[in-house]
């Protein structure tokens, strides 16, 4: 019969007498508190993957300074990492998230931290960018098996479907809660293969969760969960997944109008994808380099990156594409991406004639993507195609068609719980503003303003 563990109450860590203990990382004080509440040295050690002797040494004055050990102790006893200065606490993180704008120093520090993790070193700077994980009431199994790993993979699939069909806002809260539970399984007993598979599944889940935060407009939380995913993927030695995460970090940078920073993330991703021998992921990274170059107005670089993407797509075995890359090979998705690239070229072009030529190409690709798309393609992606189509019809002076598509897609975007979808409607508004002599265009602008002012703030950040 398995012995019942003593009480563990996560509300302990909110008590005033424990705050200085946690803030000073006084592990002896933490262990002493646990002992006073019925925990033996052996039980503490089993929870933190330490021997009874190591626990005894700590209680007798040995200091714990290693970040990974401190993190393990915090997670094992459900101590919010922020209380121990291991990551921002939920309150301080919310304060920092009021603006998604980072200082130039923040951006340099984050880029350096990502590069450090990408090359296999999780240093103190990287740990500062990890998320505060939600506490979970449910206990995790003491010993995990393949079925526990399959549960995480299955939940990843289900939340990913919700995210793609209804937007990140439909998935993010429940997904964050489940991850707070599932992440604790990393301290459970398992054989080496199962432990590695769990890390891969947790990394994929955290990447999906980061993408959902990205979609609702919370780039700060997206950055933290993607960093968390990258740490796990590197620890599990899964370079294809690491490449996918770096692609997503690149898209976060682009969402914040930082294409040069995005290129750095994507180039790190290329190293991981090539290490994995994964042409599918290499292709997606090249395609997104094209989008970053479009934001910089570098047409020749765009064409080169798209050509490289198509070459790698031709090499990829579509029957063996990783689950985190599958969507990219859905019919219509790459064509929709090309539409987005030409939409950006048009938006950033300084020459009006050239901007119109790019807009014509964007219309062609958007229409083609809509035609190619089947039920397997993300509903959100199809909505984005229509936003690109409407924007560029208006840019090419096809006013009636542009307004008609816009009215339909505004309704679609309002149904989606996607901050990206709502923010992209602004491009329709910018294009419509050039037709101020048209009553239809003016009505469209009023409709867009109404959507902007009534949308939930969490989705318009």
Give residue ranges: language-model regions.
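A short, Lys/Arg-rich alpha-helix, primarily the initiator
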Residues: 1-39, 71, 82, 93
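Short, basic-rich loop-to-helix N-cap that marks the start of a DNA-contacting helix
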Residues: 62-75
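Conserved binding/catalytic microenvironments
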Residues: 4-5, 16, 136, 140-461
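Short alpha-helical "recognition helix" segments of helix-turn-helix
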Residues: 43-46
């Amino acid at each position: 019969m398995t012995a019942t563990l003593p009480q563990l109450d996560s509300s302990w860590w909110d008590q005033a007498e424990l705050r200085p203990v946690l803030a000073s990382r006084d592990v002896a004080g933490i262990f002493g508190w646990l002992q006073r509440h019925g925990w033996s040295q052996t039980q503490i050690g089993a929870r933190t993957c330490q021997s009874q002797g190591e626990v005894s040494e700590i209680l007798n004055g040995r200091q714990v300074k290693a970040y990974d050990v401190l993190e393990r102790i915090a997670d094992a006893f459900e101590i919010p990492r922020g209380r121990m200065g291991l990551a921002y606490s939920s309150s301080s993180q919310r304060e920092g998230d009021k603006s998604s704008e980072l200082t130039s120093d923040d951006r340099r520090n984050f880029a350096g931290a990502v590069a450090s993790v990408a090359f296999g070193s999780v240093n103190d700077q990287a740990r500062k960018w990890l998320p505060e994980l939600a506490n979970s009431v449910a206990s995790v199994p003491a010993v995990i098996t393949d079925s526990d790993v399959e549960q995480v993979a299955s939940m990843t699939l289900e939340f990913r479907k919700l995210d793609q069909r209804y937007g990140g806002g439909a998935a993010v809260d429940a997904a964050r809660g489940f991850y707070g539970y599932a992440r604790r399984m990393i301290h459970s007993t398992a054989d080496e293969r199962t432990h590695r598979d769990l890390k891969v599944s947790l990394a994929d889940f955290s990447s999906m969760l980061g993408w959902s935060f990205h979609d609702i407009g919370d780039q700060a939380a997206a950055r933290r969960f993607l960093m968390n995913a990258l740490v796990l993927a590197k620890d599990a030695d899964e370079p294809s997944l690491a490449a996918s995460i770096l692609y997503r970090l690149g898209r976060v940078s682009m969402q914040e109008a930082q294409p040069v920073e995005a290129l750095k993330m994507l180039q790190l991703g290329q190293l991981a994808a090539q290490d994995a021998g994964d042409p599918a992921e290499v292709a997606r990274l090249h395609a997104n380099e094209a989008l970053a170059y479009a934001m910089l107005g570098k047409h020749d670089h765009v064409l080169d990156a798209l050509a490289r993407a198509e070459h790698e797509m031709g090499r990829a075995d579509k029957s063996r594409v990783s689950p985190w890359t599958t969507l990219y090979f859905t019919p219509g998705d790459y064509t929709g991406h090309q539409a987005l690239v030409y939409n950006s070229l048009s938006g950033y072009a300084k020459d009006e004639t050239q901007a119109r030529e790019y807009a014509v190409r964007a219309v062609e690709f958007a229409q083609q993507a809509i035609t190619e798309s089947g039920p397997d393609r993300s509903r959100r992606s199809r909505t984005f195609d229509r936003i690109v189509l409407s924007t560029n019809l208006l840019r090419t002076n096809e006013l009636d068609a542009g307004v008609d598509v816009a009215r339909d897609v505004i309704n679609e975007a309002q149904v989606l719980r996607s901050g990206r979808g709502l923010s992209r409607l602004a491009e329709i508004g910018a294009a419509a503003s050039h037709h101020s002599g048209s009553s239809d265009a003016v009505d469209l602008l009023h409709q867009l303003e109404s959507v902007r002012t009534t949308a939930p703030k969490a989705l318009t950040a």
